[in-house]
Amino acid sequence: MIHHAAPDFWSSYRSLPSEIQSVADRAFALLKADSRPPSLHFKKVDNFWSVRVGIHHRALGIDIMGGVLWFWIGTHAEYDRLIG
């Protein structure tokens, strides 16, 4: 599975504190190396793909041909509002 990041993802990413950006970098490196690492809770939530970025953050993506397009990353509270 190939992972791509949309411009909106990078906008959300840049608004995160640098320590969370580092956690996100490690999470996505792990995701690219292992398509379903248990620690990331990579799963389908309705029409979205969800991945854990540390304890308090999540990222959302959508299916595209051959992979996932990640469009958002932020706090778990924001995530709950988006998928709620």
Describe the predicted segments one by one.
Residues 15-18, 36:
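Residues in soluble alpha-helical coiled-coils and helical-bundle/repeat scaffolds
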Residues 5-6, 38:
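A short alpha-helix capping/helix-coil boundary motif
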Residues 27-53:
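A short, surface-exposed loop/turn module that caps and links secondary-structure elements
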Residues 2-4, 11, 15, 22, ...:
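Enriched for short, Lys/Arg-rich terminal
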Residues 8, 27-30, 64:
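Short alpha-helical scaffold segments that flank and stabilize functional sites
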